Amino acid sequence: MPFERYEILLPLKYNDDTAVEPEKFQATRRELVGQFGALTMDAPPVSGLWVSSGHEYQDELIRFVVDAEATPATDEFWRDFKERLKERFRQVEIWIVAYPIRLL
């Protein structure tokens, strides 16, 4: 079965510039480890920049990385999980990317 790497970018602050509560990251981590058995986190934040309605926004983000078998059930999990993350982190969009990987 082929594997994919999933990268999730989660904001450290809400859109009103208040800090996201640590419990929300902990809950996300628990869910992913419970579902897939492992998780990697890039602890130093990455910076992001985006434009909406002519206004420029900057984000500080944490990256969660999960490697998992590419199955229809995995795809369904990510679609549902993304919607929960959008609510949890009060975001219009949460960026989750997937790409094939080969384990050696």
List PLM regions with ranges.
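Positively charged, small/polar-rich N-terminal and surface patches that mediate targeting and assembly
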Residues: 1-104
